[in-house]
Curated annotation (Swiss-Prot):
The keyword Membrane applies. GO terms for cellular component: plasma membrane. Glycans are attached at N5, N265. The chain crosses the membrane at residues 26-46, 55-75, 100-120, 140-160, 198-217, 238-258, 272-292. The lineage of its organism: Eukaryota, Metazoa, Chordata, Craniata, Vertebrata. Keywords: Cell membrane, Disulfide bond, G-protein coupled receptor, Glycoprotein, Membrane, Olfaction, Receptor, Sensory transduction, Transducer, Transmembrane, Transmembrane helix. Odorant receptor. One of its GO terms (molecular function) is olfactory receptor activity. It is found in: Cell membrane. It is a multi-pass membrane protein. This is Olfactory receptor 8J3.
Length: 315
């Protein structure tokens, strides 16, 4: 067989959210605000659930780790994206791109699994309240969180090298604001059947397992709520579940749209807009949806703002 005649790609150029020069500064300001709000909200949740004695049950333990994951997911993407708004040559090295994809996969898969863990936690809390602290013990909490991170890490070290094992030898322009799977595979000059198959199987397995756990948990939660005799209690419980389900639906809907479709059907410009939701918008909204409507968190936040030392003294 004749030897291949090509120049291997050593760096990529990111097109960003928009290629319009007039929009770079306005977009920089918009996404800077989103990132700052994401940082503030999630760091606030991490701080409150770490130092306040009222927020030391399993629900807030899992919420703290969701905030850590959201913070990591945004930080893997946002700083590079913000920098690229301000420079003309939006380049990223081959290894920097691989590292970013690996970090993104670690956090996004960990978030998928953490949502399933949190759904199970809420199921036990509502359906078996008397046994809640026995079933969801400290040991189980640590085990579930450890498995969540381990699964995210194992997915990242399998999928990311697989994506970068194909040949990139023609265009090096990634039609995206970060190194994502679909735009990278679109640049490959070799057969992408194996990495596409691995990505599809991995995404399908992760999402289906997590979604089944979430749906079964919330189905039983709804049945339990319907048995509540007090109209006010039922209304409050439904309102709380609706908030969580909105966040879960937006997240899973975006992920299904992104990854469970054939590569040939991808519209990369549409994918960029969808990616904004689960890399920046959802991590920004999660602290509000999951906790700021919660009375315990509101009380803890008020006490912390009045006297930051109060929470430490009350532990």
């Amino acid at each position: 067989m004749a030897p291949e005649n090509f120049t291997r790609v050593t760096e990529f150029i990111l097109t960003g959210v928009s290629s319009c020069p007039e929009l770079q500064i306005p977009l920089f300001l918009v996404f800077l605000v989103l990132y700052v709000l994401t940082m503030a909200g999630n760091l606030g949740i991490i701080t409150l659930t770490s130092v306040d004695s009222r927020l030391q049950n399993p629900m807030y333990f899992f919420l703290r780790h969701l905030a850590i994951i959201n913070l990591g997911n945004s930080t893997v993407i946002a700083p590079k994206m913000l920098m690229n708004f301000l420079v003309k040559k939006k380049t990223t090295s081959f290894y920097e791109c691989a590292t970013q994809l690996g970090g993104f996969l670690f956090f996004i898969v960990s978030e998928v699994m953490m949502l399933a863990v949190m759904a199970y936690d809420r199921y036990v809390a509502i359906c078996n309240p008397l046994l809640y602290m026995v079933v969801v013990s400290r040991r189980l909490c640590l085990l579930l969180v450890s498995l969540t991170y381990l699964y995210g890490f194992s997915t990242a070290i399998v999928v990311s090298p697989c994506i970068f094992s194909v040949s990139y030898c023609s265009s090096n322009i990634i039609n995206h604001f970060y190194c994502d799977i679909a735009p990278l595979l679109a640049l490959s000059c070799s057969d992408t059947y194996i990495p596409e198959t691995i990505v599809f199987i991995s995404a399908a397995t992760n999402l289906v397992f997590s979604m089944i756990t979430v749906l079964v948990s919330y189905f039983n939660i709804v049945l339990s709520i319907l048995r509540i005799r007090s109209p006010e209690g039922r209304k409050k419980a439904f309102s709380t579940c609706a908030s969580h389900m909105i966040a879960v639906t937006v997240f899973y809907g975006t992920m299904l749209f992104m990854y469970l479709q054939p590569q040939t059907n991808h519209s990369l410009d549409t994918d960029k807009m969808a990616s904004v939701f689960y890399t920046l918008v959802i991590p920004m909204l999660n602290p509000l949806i999951y906790s700021l409507r919660n009375n315990d968190v509101n009380v803890a936040l008020k006490k912390f703002m009045e006297n930051p030392c109060y929470s430490f003294k009350s532990m």
